[in-house]
Amino acid sequence: MRFGEIVLSLLGGILLVGFGGGGLKDLPAASGKQADAVTGREIYSNTCIRCHGIDGKGVMGLQLVPKPADLTSPGIQGRLDASLFKRIHDGKPNTAMGAWSASLSDDEIWDVLAYVRTFRQE
């Protein structure tokens, strides 16, 4: 390895550690229990369905600007669990997607995420 490549590698590592890998390292872990898609479905039906619809495609909230995310899309399904957890927990600024951290426990958010993962298109 050349000296320049070593320096760049070290700088990249320092930046990654210094910025916390995009802020995802501080996410709460599930409490040790397996996330439950069945429980997640019940929570989804009471909280998320209004905008994201029964099938997760977002058709219930088409009147919203911007439209709700299509939870079946490869763009959503391809995201890391930690990223989706953070979105549910913290919401998305300037959209109708509010933070659910005041209403749902971390375990409940993980359960919802387990259910959302059932929307994956084959």
Residue spans of the language-model regions?
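Residues within well-ordered alpha-helical secondary structure of globular protein domains
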Residues: 12, 22, 46, 90, ...
